[in-house]
Amino acid sequence: MKSINNNILNLFLLAALVFTGCSEATFLDEQNPNAITPDTFWKTEKQFTSALSAAYSALQFQSVSGGELQYEFVLGDIAGTESWYRPNAFRNLTFNDGIYHVTDKWNELYIGIFRANQVIEYIQTAEDSEFSDNSKAEIEAQARFLRAFFYFQLAHTYGGGMIHDKVASTDAEFSKPFSSIDDINSTIIIPDLKFAKDNLPQTWNAKNQGRATWGAATSLLGKVYLYDENWGEAASLFKTVIDSQVYELTRNIEDNFQHENEFNKESIFEVNYSFDIAPGVNGAVVDDSAFESGAESSAMATAVGQLNFGAFNTVLPSYNLHEMLVYDEVDTENPINDDNIESRRMNSTIAPSNGEGLYYQIPYTEARGWGFGQSAYVKKHSNWYHLEAEPAQNRSGINFRHIRYADVLLMYAEAVLKDSNDYTTAIAYIDMVRSRAGVITLQKYMDDNGGSFPQLHVSKQVHGDHPLVAANPQTVLTHLQRVERAIELCFEGHRWKDLVRWGIAKEVFDELHADEVWRQTNFSTLVVGEAPLFIAERIRPDFVKAAENYSPTQHNYFPIPSGEVQTNDNLNN
């Protein structure tokens, strides 16, 4: 969303600082009748709409929806990196309170919170007559949704945060104590989302694509309850979204990760980026300044795209993810398939050395890469499907989807499983996602195997086969946690939060490290050309340090940035 009027909002802060630094006489002598102040700005619907656009623009920050998410992608079980890349500190769990991204995300989320707070606070005293129809309530509802979204990200990245529900103007108001996730939920997130749910439309017209909707607020509220293990409330909200028939799965899963067919029927909350606006500006630049306009672009593709095609591949699919996608078995009876060997889900997610079709407009056999233990590259969020190389200056116009319908279906399956052990219903909703991917459903596996299905997260390369397990609440939950959410939603910002809330990070790291040890020991047999992973030259050690270093108290959440600790009197006393 275009970053408009950010300079106006920054003037408010500047004016406040100037006022506190001048004597009363000087201030009275040097009034500027043309100056924009809170008393003159926060009046009309147009002014509030402009300020709301600035709050939306905070979604484009690279740590929120763009290239800096690479650091979070490598935290869990779906990805690794190389030792010379910056994400390695997150892969090895050696990050600290002063490192990039830990500080960037904190700062950028609070910028978003500040901008939303401005709209929420000042609209309370705005005259109703200045607004048309329901626009006043809709503007407040959008701002409250955004504030809730930013606080959800803050709470589940840092384990809590400082609650700012008003625009701070004094040192005392800036220095707040650290509040828990529960406190943030009850004080900010849940009330804001309930208000948003009750006051937002189901859909907007084409001119307003990207604005928060009833479905976004309801889905995020359900997610809040899911994370809080309030299973019944979560299930009820997800089912309301499902039954609304506003959303559906796209026929082609790749429509969710490319610049074509954006804001489609599967999209519930999506952040808009553009390649064409502000050409020449680096994609990492978000806000307008006195020197240049914000890029409106994402730097994500430069991070995840392949090194030989103008990117850096700082995020690499883990062998575990690669192997699960290899065995994401195509259902030849599903009409979505057309003699393809790879599942639609695999083809839109990763690029193995033996991939199908074209990759950056050339056959895989002509492309370079896949050496030094790099068995696959990330396709999702990159421009592999329509360009010969990633654009210069970190620019990509691919939107980022924070909430999509497939996620809601899987969260609903989890909620009913945990609430009532109803694994039959859970399987039905998991299979909706699997069917769209064109792969064999759990139900079909069960029909063919006497009520059992394979544990696809267990490495067939390492352990010889996928064990068959009878369907029951626990085995279906394990499949949902280790397989379905991992491969359907990988590189979308959910995985580490999932592993943390389930409490299985240590178990997963230990298992995947053991698989690495086996591959190291048996490396002489894992030569180029051998299925399923075609690993060349070495085994990449993604999980040796993670398994060794992981501590829930140290790594489940990022530390409070050192700068906040040093300046916040309520933290350093």
Functional labels for PLM-detected ranges:
Residues 22-70, 557-573:
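Membrane-proximal, proline-rich intrinsically disordered regions
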Residues 46, 61-63, 86-94, 98-107, ...:
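Elongated scaffold/linker segments in the mid-to-C-terminal portions of large proteins
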Residues 66-84, 164-166, 200-220, 226-296, ...:
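Short, surface-exposed recognition loops and adjoining beta-strand edges that mediate ligand/DNA contacts
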